[in-house]
Every structure is written in C-alpha cells, then in structure tokens.
Amino acid sequence: VIWKDDNKIFYKYFNPSSKERSLNIANPDGTDWEKVVDISFKDINIAPVPQSGLVSFWNTPDAFQETVFQSVSIVGKSAKTLFTGKFGADYLWNWDGTKSLVSHTDARGGSGIDLGVINDQGGEYKNLEIPTLVSKCVWSKDNKTVYFALSGSLPDNILMPNDYDAKKFTTTDTFWKMDVTTGKKDRVIELEKMQGSYDATNLFLSPDEGSLFFINRIDDKLYKVTM
C-alpha cells in the first residue's frame, strides 16, 4: 500500500476465489475502491509518477527475474510498459516525474549492481557507472542531482539485490552526489570526517537540502549528514 496523495491509497489485491491480482485505488479506510489494472506478478512495488495522473509498478526485484516497469492511468486503462531487459531492477522517480533512476544486476543472477537513469517514457537509458541501489539514493528538487551512498567492497559470491534485501550482509558506505546530466560526482562528506560504519538506506533531504538523513541498517538508527 502507498499513498497517492493526501486522501487516496494504491494497493495490490489478490482475489482468492478467482486467483486474480489487481492494482486498486481507494480511500484510506478502504471505501470507494476501484480497480486500476490487472497485474500478473505476485509481488510488486508501486510508485505514483509525480505531477501526473499515472501510477507506476514493477515486479519486486529478483536477480533471476527480468523486471517489467509499467505505468497506468489512475482512471484505469491498459498498462504501458516503460522499461524491460534488466534483472533485479528497482526504480526511483525524480520530483517532476521526468526521470527515474534504475538499479539492476550486472547480469542475470549476478553479484554486481549498476545504477542508470531513464526518461519518463522509459527511453534514453544511461548507465551512471555507480554500483549502488536506488534504496541508497535520493533526488534533489532540482531534478538532476542525486545524493547517494556508495558501498565499499562487497562479499564474494553474493546474489544482488536478493542477499542485501534479505539482510545477509551489511555495507560500509561513503556519501556522494552526482549531476546525472553531466556525470560530475562530488563527495558529500570527506573520509576523514566520517566516524563509524554506515549501511545507509531510506535517504531523504531536509527542506533546504542542507542535510542528508538516512537509516543505518547496522544499528537501525537515524543519522544526519550536514552538507
């Protein structure tokens, strides 16, 4: 279940009688529900497309399964496929819905991760040459700058993103930002100023974008980086 706005939710529904799965919209208490579209995958991620009447969805990332990134109008029409061909993919829209980050395995059943960017139609894929997950990223409101946590060396013979999502290991991250239009990267905080180890996820920025917040999976505490 995710929020569409202040007064509606999107949710996946499984009908045990018909065995059909669907994406639906309703009031927060479940009333006034409507089916948006039928879906074929058992587990999906859902994200509204900002500043549009669309909602996007995709099968939950799995290194052995090709991810199908789709969108559909909330008034309920046929779903449109935006992007396919990547395994274990996950997505993160920017603030105006013109771009989405996509993290995916470097191969089917792979142990590496690539981060790329696509436009709102799923085209113009660009590999950003950053080995990180979208769960370690956050967009600036300028819609072109991405703040991200970059992991150090990963264990051998892991399956990504499956093993990370299953919390079979933790990472040791450093913090960066990148202009996705130019490819320019800069550290957010220098190494000598970092104390402790951080496996950062659920990143978000302060309203003035002067601070970066994240949850450290090592101790489940909230941290702040002042920029």
Place the predicted regions along the sequence by residue.
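Short loop/turn segments immediately following beta-strands, especially the blade-tip
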Residues: T226-M227
